[in-house]
Amino acid sequence: MHRAARPTVKSRATAAPSTAATWAVIALFVAARVFMLLAQPWASEDAYITFRYAWHLAHGNGLVFNPGEWVMGFTSPLWTLWCALGITLGAAPETWAQWTSLLFGAWALHTAMQQLARHASRTSAVAFGLAYALWPLFSALTASGLEMEFLFAGMVIAGTQVHARGRGAGVALGLLALTRPEGTVAALVLACFADRRARLVGGAIVALGAGLLAWAYGSPLPHSVLAKRTLYGTPGPWVGRHWLDWLLPLPMLTHTAAREGAHLARLGWLWLPAAVLGVPAGFRLRATPVAWIALAGLTVWAGYAALGVAYFWWYSMIPVVTLFWLAALGLSRLPRWATRWPVLAAAALILALSWLDLFPVYLGRAQNEFRTFHPIADALRSRARPSDLVMAEPIGLIGFVTMLPILDESGLVSPETLQRRKLGDGWYTDLVARRQPRWLVIRPAVLATGEAFAGRGRPFRDDAGRLAILRDYHSVWPVAPAQSDALWLMERRP
C-alpha cells in the first residue's frame, strides 16, 4: 500500500545549526538548570503529592495517597510511574525528578533546535534555544520536580516522530497523551498529521492506559482536575484573560495573576511583534513538525484562556514556550541583516538579565514553601501516631514527610471533601464533626476571618462553628504567634 503524499511546502533551511552553536546553547541550558537546582534543592509543594503516590507504589501499597483509598489525586500517570521507578532504584524522589527533568529538557532542546534549523532557519533554532535555556521560568520548573519539561519533551519528540513517519510515532503519541490532560490535547492535535499506523498504536496505548486507570479509580480523569474545576470553576475568557493580557506591553491594562506575566508584559514590545510574524511563518511551514508543535501549544493555550482556567505558575510552561517558539519563527521572516548575531546577542542579554528580577521570585517562592511547611511536618511527625488522621491543606510536603492518613480540605485526594464543599458553607465544621481528625493543619487567617483559603464555600456557617474549632482543638505549633499566611498545627483536646 502506498502512503499518501504530504503537501510539499518548502522549508527555508535544510541544515542543522552549527555544532558549536548547538553545544553553546546546551551549555547555557545546563548551567542555568544546575544553578537553579543548587540554589533550590527541594521540590515544589505539589510535586510531593506525586512523590507520595510514587512512594506507596514503590513500597507495594499501590498507586494511592492513603493506603486503601483509590483516588487519582495525581495529574500525570506517566510521571508518577517514572518517579516510582526512581524510588525503586533507591533515588530520592526530589533528586530523581529534578535531574531527569534536566535530561528530558536537554533532549527537547536539542531536538527542537534541529527541527527549527531544518524547517525554518538557523537563526530561529538559536533564538528558541537561547530562550528555552535562559528564561528563568523553565529552570524553576526543572527544580520544581513537576512534569512540565517532561510534557514539552513529549510534544517535541512526538511531533518529530509523526513527521518522520517513524515506527515510534504511535508510541510517542500514546505516551504524550498520558503525561497530563494538556498532553492529551497536544497528542490529539499531532495525531491529525500522523499516519494510520501511528494513530492506531497511539490510540491503543491511550485505551490501555485509560482502561487501567478506570479499573483502578473508576474514571480515567484525574480527580485532582475535577477538584480544581469544582473549587475554582471554568468562568470563561474574561476571567481567563490572565493567560493573554501579558502579551501587551501595557502594564495599566494587565491583569496578570503572578510575576511571570508582569515581567513578560514589560518585554511585550520584543516578544509580541516577533510572535505575530511567526504565525504566517508557521502557516508556510504547515507540512512540518515546527508548525504542528506550535499548533499543539496554541491549542492548549487557547483552552486555558477560553475556559478561564485558574492560574498555577507551572501551567504557564506551555503558553510561554509557545510564545518563544512563534517568536523564533518570526525572526526567520526578518531581513538577513537583522537576524544575525547582534539581534541574538541582544536577546540573550535580555534573557540573562531577567534572572535579576525573576530568580528571587522563584527562589523565594520555593524557600517560603519549604520554611513554612517543613517545620509543621517535623512537628507533626514527632507527635503523631501512625494511625492518626490529619485534616490538612497543603498536603504535599506535609503528607510526604509524615506519611500519615490525610483528609484533604481541598478535595484533591479526598472525594468526600469535594462532595461536601459542593453543598456550600459549613463544610469544614461538618467534616471535622464527621471524621474527628486528631490533628488539624490550618492557616490562622481562616480561623480569624472565617474565609476559605481557596475555592468555593465558607468553612464555617457562622461564628459558632469557628469558635467550636478553637474550643475542641488547641495549637501545639508554632509556640510563638504566627503570621497570617503561616500554618498552625492543632491537636484535638482530650
Where are these regions (language model features)?
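Membrane-lumen/periplasm interface segments of multi-pass, membrane-embedded glycan/lipid transferases
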Residues: R52, H59-T75, G218-P280, A310-W313, ...
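Transmembrane-helix motifs of polytopic, lipid-linked glycan transferases
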Residues: W99-A120, S124, I157
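Membrane-embedded, lumen/periplasm-facing catalytic core of multi-pass transferases
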Residues: A346-G399, P405-A445, L467-P494
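Hydrophobic, aromatic-rich transmembrane alpha-helices
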Residues: A27, H110-A112, A187-A194, T256-W301, ...
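Specific aromatic-rich, kink-prone transmembrane helix
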Residues: L109-Q114, A131, F150-A169, V189-A191, ...
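Transmembrane alpha-helix segments characteristic
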Residues: W23-V30, V126-F128, Y132, G203-G211, ...
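Hydrophobic/aromatic-rich transmembrane helices and adjacent perimembrane loops
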Residues: T179-P181, V185, W269, V309-P335
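Membrane-interface alpha helices of multi-pass inner-membrane proteins
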Residues: F128-P136, V156-A158, R167-P181, A187-C192, ...
